[in-house]
Every structure is written in C-alpha cells, then in structure tokens.
Amino acid sequence: MKRVAKRSFKPVFACLLLPRYDSAGVKIMLKIQLSIRIERPYVGLVSRVWLRQAVKLTLVHTGMSSPVELGLVIAGDDTVHELNRSYRNVDSTTDVIAFALSERGANAEPFITPPDDVIHLGEVIISYPQAKRQAEERCHPLERELALLVAHGVLHLLGYDHELPEQAEKMRAMESRVLDTMKG
C-alpha cells in the first residue's frame, strides 16, 4: 500500500465569532473553531481569508447556531487520490473529500453535544490541482471554485448529500447561495 506523502504544512487555527440572529431577532454569536492547513506547494496561492469566509457563509446559510469545530486542508492530487482510494475505494483523485465525525442528516441518531458544547464536524480536504483544473474547465476564477468546494465539503459534514436528484438540487441551491454572497 502506498503511503500518503508526509505533509509539509502547519495548521493555522482561527476562532471566529460571527453575529447571527435567532427567530425572535435576538443577536447570537456563532463560534467557529477552524483549522486551515495548506500543503507547502500551495501556500501563498490560496487566501486563508477567502477560505474562512466560505466556511462562515456556508454555516450561516444552513442556519447553524451551535459552536462548531472543523478542519480544512488544501492538498495535492497525490494526497487526495490516496484518501479517495483508502476510504472510498475509488482509484483516482477527486476535488473534495469530507470526513464527518458523526452521522448527520434526516435518518441519523440525535447528535449528543460534547461537554464543551462545541460540535466537532470533521475535516474537508480539497485538491488544489483539481480545483484549478475545474476552474479552467468552467471558465471561472479559481477562488470561486475553491469557495464552491469548501461549501460542498462543509455541507457534507452537516449531513447534506447528492445521491438522489432532490438531495442534489437542495445541495446545489445551498452552494449557489454561498457563492452569491461571497465578497472578494
């Protein structure tokens, strides 16, 4: 079995407080603990601010109000290919893989919040080279493709899926809402 190349990046942690309003119009703060790791060849090619914004907007548009923690990795094709092969039995690279720490969604067991009240969502891994290829194919900026992939991965962590047409439509609509509100 081929080993995934040793990662040559260090994580950068951010704790974000994002104002939100509940159904009664009361202001609440959404706490997001976000770890962003970028493999060495891609450092400087990706804006951490842009990635954080994509995560925040995705959580806002889904109505998330509980404190959350998640990781985001920008990696190369080799890393993503190996993860895809190891965990999904697909022997090719892909654009984004999400590893949820708990089963979420309509048929999932109720989620028990840990003592720190932070919901540990999981990790999203994006292939920078694949994102770049897709941006070129779709004739839009790489930043837009990265925001789309961040939103897609975070939605998977929250239990969204695209196996059925109605699920895919709901997920695409949510991704579009995120992209429409991205500023840059």
PLM regions with names:
Residues 2-147, 155-184:
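An acidic/histidine-cluster motif and surrounding catalytic segment
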